[in-house]
Amino acid sequence: MFSRRNLVALGLAATVSAGPCDIYEAGDTPCVAAHSTTRALYSSFSGALYQLQRGSDDTTTTISPLTAGGVADASAQDTFCANTTCLITIIYDQSGNGNHLTQAPPGGFDGPDVDGYDNLASAIGAPVTLNGQKAYGVFMSPGTGYRNNEATGTATGDEPEGMYAVLDGTHYNDACCFDYGNAETSSTDTGAGHMEAIYLGNSTTWGYGAGDGPWIMVDMENNLFSGADEGYNSGDPSISYSFVTAAVKGGADKWAIRGGNAASGSLSTYYSGARPDYSGYNPMSKEGAIILGIGGDNSNGAQGTFYEGVMTSGYPSDDVENSVQENIVAAKYVSGSLVSGPSFTSGEVVSLRVTTPGYTTRYIAHTDTTVNTQVVDDDSSTTLKEEASWTVVTGLANSQCFSFESVDTPGSYIRHYNFELLLNANDGTKQFHEDATFCPQAPLNGEGTSLRSWSYPTRYFRHYENVLYAASNGGVQTFDSKTSFNNDVSFEIETAFAS
């Protein structure tokens, strides 16, 4: 029970001027870690929210709120990253404990980057507005992860804690594991009960809930729990809002899952009760590391989008969490534009010309399933003209973006697979739709457009040795070379050779 003093303090903290961590503080469950790329989570916070590194010269900068307690300065990011690419290298802890999140190291599983590290997220994959002010979330493709194995003040053993995260309920998969929360300090699986983290996705390998997902569950290691029992729990609903509030808390022989729409309404309780009655989960053996986008052993096949989240000391009351939800709703999250450059019109037929000096007579075409560049002109054969012409359709995975259907092979689209661009028939799956959706960006060399992958926003259409890839600006693949990257990912949009 709250004292009258705490209830009054909580009421004051729930005003729009307060941040989520002010509310937790008023409820005697202070934040020990607070992460967001979109806004300050304390009313007085004016420090760095996150660090960027740009691809043109590897220079870094930090992005802070426009005002204390306010929204991130997206214009500073846009200026810093103009005509190049940017990665989010650090997500700073606002709590003062120094629990910053950086590129996750290898563990039980290696990541795809150099030396087994996970990938870093693109800085532009999740644009939003908060009360009309532009900001960017953290769009995390499979293989992307952040971690802190030396966190301070987080719960260990069976100590009580709470956490929440604002996530995208439309961006998920069934792989392990899109988590935010408490994990092992070794980046390896050290046994049941060694984690307590929010999970969002539609995995059914361990626990699952009602409907087809995604579900908010709790990753306690060696199991995702949707309720008291292993496997199915009907009380855990599918939750697919564009902005989801996921709240989890755990203490001695008790834990809870709560959730709701981060843009409106209140939180619902999906489970609140005793710990799972299976070996290792009562008491818990939490280790206190912090993860984002991955499992405790660096399982990194999941995808999702993170906007903000905190971890607390102590078991927050429902009243505190309800007030935090009111604060989140008052922030007025709205999805932003994924398109920044010359766009397309659904239904038009186009040809896309290379702008790299010395290659400007070449167009994106295909030979069977291989997407490549070929020299095409008015005297070319009808067959080649058709192979170099593309029907633009509304993005199969996201209606803001576009997909490109072959004129000579109707029903087949450009998609990435192992980061090669291929022409494949649409099989109707979620995976294909995501692989075949691309978002026009301002051209990196100033000519035409640059087309980035919706599902891997660090990767763009790139011609390399006359073959098309989904390439990043630097990376482990030969086609990720930084040499001539801006030219190689910029294409002029021209009238199609065939329709």
Curated annotation (Swiss-Prot):
Residues that carry a glycan: N83, N202
Similarity-based family: Belongs to the glycosyl hydrolase 54 family.
Coiled coil start-end: none
Biochemical pathway: Glycan metabolism; L-arabinan degradation
Induction cue: By growth on polymeric substrates and L-arabitol.
Entries under Pfam families matching the protein: AbfB (PF05270), ArabFuran-catal (PF09206)
Gene responsible for this protein: abfB
EC number: 3.2.1.55
Family matches, as InterPro entries: A-L-arabinofuranosidase_B_cat, ABFB, AbfB_ABD, AbfB_ABD_sf, ConA-like_dom_sf
Cleaved signal peptide residues: 1-18
Known function: Able to hydrolyze 1,5-, 1,3- and 1,2-alpha-linkages not only in L-arabinofuranosyl oligosaccharides, but also in polysac-charides containing terminal non-reducing L-arabinofuranoses in side chains, like L-arabinan, arabinogalactan and arabinoxylan.
Top EC category: hydrolase
Keyword annotations from UniProtKB, A to Z: Glycoprotein, Glycosidase, Hydrolase, Signal
Keyword Cell division: no
Protein name: Alpha-L-arabinofuranosidase B
Sample GO molecular function, one term: alpha-L-arabinofuranosidase activity
PANTHER family tied to this protein: ALPHA-L-ARABINOFURANOSIDASE B (PTHR39447:SF2)
Biological process according to GO: arabinan catabolic process; L-arabinose metabolic process; pectin catabolic process
Catalytic activity: Hydrolysis of terminal non-reducing alpha-L-arabinofuranoside residues in alpha-L-arabinosides
